[in-house]
Amino acid sequence: MASADWGYDSKNGPDQWSKLYPIANGNNQSPIDIKTSEAKHDSSLKPVSVSYNPATAKEIVNVGHSFHVVFDDSSNQSVLKGGPLADSYRLTQFHFHWGNSNDHGSEHTVDGAKYSGELHLVHWNSAKYSSAAEAISKADGLAIIGVLMKVGPANPNLQKVLDALSSVKTKGKRAPFTNFDPSSLLPSSLDYWTYFGSLTHPPLHESVTWVICKESISLSPEQLAQLRGLLSSAEGEPAVPVLSNHRPPQPLKGRTVRASF
């Protein structure tokens, strides 16, 4: 996945992705607008169960359009089970999406309402596949927890992550990031909506069972500004900040959104 051929500006942004990635116009694309009146309560949905080992946090990487906090996923130490999932899924990384102002930046919307940002915790099906790279293109390959972020009080649980950004300011930089429990970033209620969708940026594989938390988490305007301080340019190049990195909602095309609550 060459990140040079896509991005979030007018020349290479979401409207252009279908030229290189025709699946961008597929039937199961993400994100979506969640219409709460049309989400169907499904009593068969189980509670979501996460068990994360802080020792599996490994490093933080500037990938150009965002940054990833990467986990050791060589064994089942940090896993997601339950919810809509038949298998156990292993945490591989989390990342964020944001916008150039505080009134938008999330990828998923709820009844048309935009949030200030969105956290994605990415897991792969370790019961069926041997690596994230193998699972990424399989229909049951990935499960992503999406947490909407709303501007408000500062979030102390986010601060360790945000403070590490200075060590990976430019594209391609990586730095150790250890002993972190990502469950500290989850809301207190794990009520959720779920639907079948895709990665929200190229290669846009339709391989994701989405678990979108009903409850949002907060972060302050200053914390949002820290996200926007990340650079998509490499060291020695003119500085290009990542001001915005979210895809707009895609058509539902007949899919069902289920609610656990």
Swiss-Prot record:
Per the record's keyword annotation, is Lyase included, yes or no? yes
- In this chain, Zn(2+) is annotated as bound at 95, 97, 120
A biological process term (GO) from this entry:
response to fructose
Catalytic machinery residues: 65
Where it mainly occurs, coarsely classed, is cytoplasm
Q: Name one GO molecular function term.
A: hydro-lyase activity
Instruction: Write the protein's name.
Output: Carbonic anhydrase 1
Per the UniProt record, the source organism is Rattus norvegicus (Rat)
Q: Which gene encodes it?
A: Ca1
